[in-house]
A protein has these predicted regions:
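Short, composition-biased motifs enriched in small/polar/acidic residues
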Residues: 361-437
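Low-complexity, Pro/Thr/Ser/Gly/Ala-rich linker/spacer regions in secreted
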Residues: 1, 266-267, 332, 353-374, ...
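Solvent-exposed segments in extracellular or luminal domains encompassing
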Residues: 317-330, 419
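Exposed beta-strand and adjacent loop surfaces of beta-rich binding modules
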Residues: 13, 285, 299-303, 379, ...
Length: 437
């Protein structure tokens, strides 16, 4: 297996694996080039382009005895590793057997080299455009198809097939497909009640339902014709990559793909402290840090909380606070990360949000000043008591803002008596005892 694209650990990336089909041993070097071009083409199209950093890509080089693929309609048969074939009736459709001679081989290779693969792509070395979704399990595309969607060209067959595999998007074709199950997908529906349409959050109140084609491009509505039916089935927009080659995904399909990415990848790549449950017993400042997986064109939103209360201005990747600002006992420090992309309007499972919470048990020394005594000569004394194993500092202030140290000492049997050294009248003075940081 050869790495094509690395953006981070495979445990938190959407891992693409491209497998060679119809490449002889002498053509495997070209396969790596073709696989790289295929990945770059796919990730150049929205919404993948915005989330390119969320992907890794790899190539598995498997030699075939012969180059190309079967074309039964032309009487051409090739001896290839995955036994791919163009459909005899629809020569744009490429499939591999679902048994151990095709799909089983793909599964075995992925299990050996990349068990955490979320998007397998079988790249067929054939100039005739074609592909399929491998019955929902993988994207299959020919080199002839991929060459037509490299930048600056628009999305094509490969991009279309990944919509099936990643987001379970449906075909928006209107030509009949006998026996195709009448199951709705994220972008197809039979529903005509405006209030019940699954993508209603994208539909403007002044858009007619059903929506006439005269409304034009870029308007989300309810356009008749989808799911291999001319009538009775509806799609979100007039044109979309799930119905036409050479056009981008519509808003609803783009949303479904972004949600599909976040089903597999979390926005928080790492955090510090690594332990989310710890104790503190000193005043040393605590710093919490996030490592985020940022999209290409916008940044994720961050908000820090202490005990459920949002901290004003705490929106950076790190957050520092003093344990003194927390109560003794159990406290919770949380960071909420949101992707506020305009590509998603409906996220019922909150996939675009992640919260990291640290449970911090605070046991800071508790000091008290009490039992003031008036002494002769204008002096006085008071007692410091409580718990301060690392010692304490007595400080004084005339305004409660500026504090000056007077004495550093330790408690003996839980207490200490302080006597002021100044004789005679003195200005009003405030005193406190604090533990060192």
């Amino acid at each position: 297996m050869q790495t094509i694209l690395t953006n981070g650990p495979t445990s938190n990336r959407l891992n693409i694996v491209v497998l060679s089909e119809g490449y002889t041993n002498s053509q495997l070097a070209q396969f790596v080039v073709d696989a790289t071009n295929a990945v770059n083409a796919l990730l150049s199209h929205p919404p993948y382009q915005e989330y390119r950093n969320y992907f890794n890509a790899f190539a598995i080089k498997i030699a075939s005895n012969q180059s190309g693929s079967d074309h039964p309609s032309s009487g051409i048969y090739r001896d290839t590793y995955f036994n791919s074939t163009y459909d005899p009736l629809a020569d744009y459709l490429i499939t591999i057997p679902v048994d151990s001679t095709g799909q089983g081989k793909v599964d075995a290779l992925l299990q050996s080299f990349m068990p955490n693969c979320q998007l397998p792509i079988v790249l067929v070395n054939d100039p005739t455009q074609g592909g399929s979704d491998g019955f929902g399990t993988m994207a299959i595309a020919s080199t002839g198809a991929v060459s037509g969607e490299k930048p600056p060209y628009p999305p094509g067959i490969l991009t279309h097939e990944t919509g099936h595999v990643l987001a379970n998007l449906g075909d928006e074709y209107t030509a009949p497909y006998s026996g195709f199950p009448d199951t709705e997908e994220p972008n197809t529906t039979q529903q005509t009640n405006r209030l019940l349409i699954k993508w209603k959050v994208w539909v403007s109140t002044n858009t007619p339902i059903p929506t006439p084609e005269t409304v034009g491009e870029g308007v989300v509505g309810l356009f008749e014709g989808a799911h291999y039916h001319e009538t009775g089935w509806y799609r979100p927009e007039l044109n979309c990559a799930m119905g036409n080659l050479g056009v981008p995904f519509c808003s609803v399909c783009s949303e479904a793909l972004v949600l599909a990415i976040y089903q597999r990848v979390r926005p928080v790549d790492g955090f510090s402290p690594a332990s989310t449950n710890f104790s503190v017993s000193t005043n040393q400042a605590l710093t919490f840090t996030l490592s985020l997986l940022q999209p290409t064109m916008h940044n994720l939103d961050v908000q820090w909380f202490t005990n459920g209360v949002a901290r004003s201005g705490a929106t950076n990747l790190s957050f520092t606070l003093s344990p003194e600002s927390l109560s003794n006992g159990t406290n919770w420090i949380s960071a909420r990360v949101n992707d506020l992309t305009s590509l998603v309007r409906n996220d019922p499972a909150n996939l675009l949000s992640q919260i990291v919470t640290w449970t911090v048990d605070v046991t800071l020394p508790q000091l008290r000043l009490d039992s003031p005594l008036r002494l002769t000569g204008g002096k006085f004394a008071f007692r410091v008591s409580g718990n301060a194993p690392q010692g304490f500092v007595i400080q004084s202030s005339t305004n409660l803002l500026d504090w000056a140290p007077l004495e550093t000492n330790y408690l003996v049997a839980g207490q200490f008596w302080h006597t002021n050294s100044a004789a005679g009248p003195s200005p009003r003075m405030f005193y406190r005892a604090a533990t060192p940081p």
